[in-house]
Design a protein with these regions (language model features):
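N-terminal targeting signals for export/organelle localization
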Residues: 2-62
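Thiol/disulfide oxidoreductase modules built on the thioredoxin-like
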Residues: 135-142, 148-170
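Short loop/turn microsegments at loop-to-beta-strand junctions
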Residues: 62-63, 85, 164-165
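Conserved hydrophobic packing residues within short motifs/helices of P-loop NTPase cores
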Residues: 87, 121-123, 168
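Short active-site neighborhood of thiol/selenol oxidoreductases, capturing the structured segment around
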Residues: 75-98
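Conserved helix-turn-beta segment immediately C-terminal to the redox Cys motif
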Residues: 83-84, 99-122, 137
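Thiol-based oxidoreductase modules, predominantly thioredoxin-like and allied folds used
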Residues: 116-129, 141-151
Length: 170
C-alpha cells in the first residue's frame, strides 16, 4: 500500500512539475541544470547543496522538526515515522505554489487523507498565521498547513536563498 501511495504521489508531482513548466512562452530558452553540488558556508557551518538548492539527498534521514499547524496543533516529523510523508514547502507570494496547490489537494490529499499510512503537510515559509489562512482559503486547500517562521524548517531541507515550491517525499 505504501508503494502505491509513493507511486501515485510521484506521478502527481511529476505531472504538476511538467504542467507548471509548460507555461513557457515560445522563444524562451531551455536551461539545463547541472547536478554538481555547491558548498555554502554560513555562520561557520558548511552546507552541501545540489545545483537546485536541496541539502537533503535521496536515501538520507530526513531532518526532524516540530511545526505548529494553522489549527494550533503541533506535529513532529518523527511522530510520523513509518508513514509516507509529503512536505510541500510553499508561500502565498509563490505563483507556482498557487498553481500546484489545488492539484495537490485534488490528486493527492483528497485521495489519501484517510489512509493511516500517509501524511501531507504544507509548510508556509515565513508568513504570519492570518496570511497563511487567507492563502489556504484562496487556493481552496484543506490539507494541514504549518507555519515556518524564519524559514528554519525550510533551511533543514534546502538553502534559504533557494526558491520554492519544493515538495519532499519521505
Amino acid at each position: 500500500m505504501k508503494m502505491k501511495i509513493m507511486n501515485v504521489c510521484s506521478v502527481a508531482l511529476l505531472a504538476i512539475g511538467i504542467w507548471a513548466c509548460s507555461g513557457q512562452k515560445k522563444g524562451t530558452a531551455n536551461v539545463e541544470v547541472a547536478t554538481d553540488s555547491v558548498e555554502v558556508t554560513a555562520d561557520a557551518k558548511s552546507v552541501q547543496a545540489d545545483s537546485t538548492g536541496y541539502i537533503v539527498r535521496v536515501g538520507e534521514m530526513a531532518p526532524d522538526f516540530t511545526i505548529t499547524l494553522t489549527d494550533g496543533k503541533h506535529v513532529s516529523l518523527s511522530s510520523l515515522r513509518g508513514k509516507v510523508v509529503m512536505l510541500q514547502f510553499t508561500a502565498s507570494w509563490c505563483g507556482v505554489c498557487r498553481k500546484e496547490m489545488p492539484f495537490i489537494e485534488k490528486d493527492i490529499w483528497l485521495k489519501h487523507k484517510n489512509n493511516a499510512d500517509f501524511a501531507l503537510i504544507g509548510i508556509d515559509r515565513d508568513e504570519p498565521l492570518d496570511k497563511v489562512l487567507a492563502f489556504a482559503k484562496s487556493t481552496g486547500v484543506t490539507y494541514p498547513l504549518g507555519l515556518d517562521p524564519g524559514a528554519d524548517i525550510f533551511a533543514k531541507y534546502a538553502l534559504r536563498e533557494s526558491g520554492i515550491t519544493r515538495n519532499v517525499l519521505i
